[in-house]
Structures are given as C-alpha cells and as structure tokens.
Curated annotation (Swiss-Prot):
It comes from Brucella abortus (strain 2308). This is UPF0391 membrane protein BAB1_1670. Pfam families: DUF1328. The chain crosses the membrane at residues 5-25, 29-48. It comes from the Bacteria. It is a multi-pass membrane protein.
Length: 54
C-alpha cells in the first residue's frame, strides 16, 4: 500500500512541475494534434474492418 502512495506522489509531483511550468501550453497543442490524428486512424480502421467483413 505504501508503494502506491509513493508512486502517486511521484506522479503528482511530475504533473505539478509540468503544469506550473511553461511546458503546459506546448503540450496542449501537441495533444490536440495527436488526438485528431488518432481519431482519423480510428475511423479508417473501423471502415477497413467493415469492408473486410462484408
């Protein structure tokens, strides 16, 4: 149980450091681009799967 507390503490410290630093704005822009790229890949995969089954 103490292991999980330490892991979550480290994750929270890293998230806080990145959130309060200047990296947050750049990371948000990159995350938006990656979201739309993977959304497009999902749609292409679903269409290819539907065509393959038909």
């Amino acid at each position: 149980m103490l292991y999980y507390v330490l892991v979550f503490l480290v994750v929270a410290l890293v998230a806080g450091a990145l959130g309060f630093g200047g990296i947050a704005g750049a990371s948000a822009g990159i995350a938006q681009i990656l979201f739309f790229v993977f959304l497009a890949l999902l749609v292409i995969s679903l269409i290819a799967s539907a065509i393959r089954k038909a």
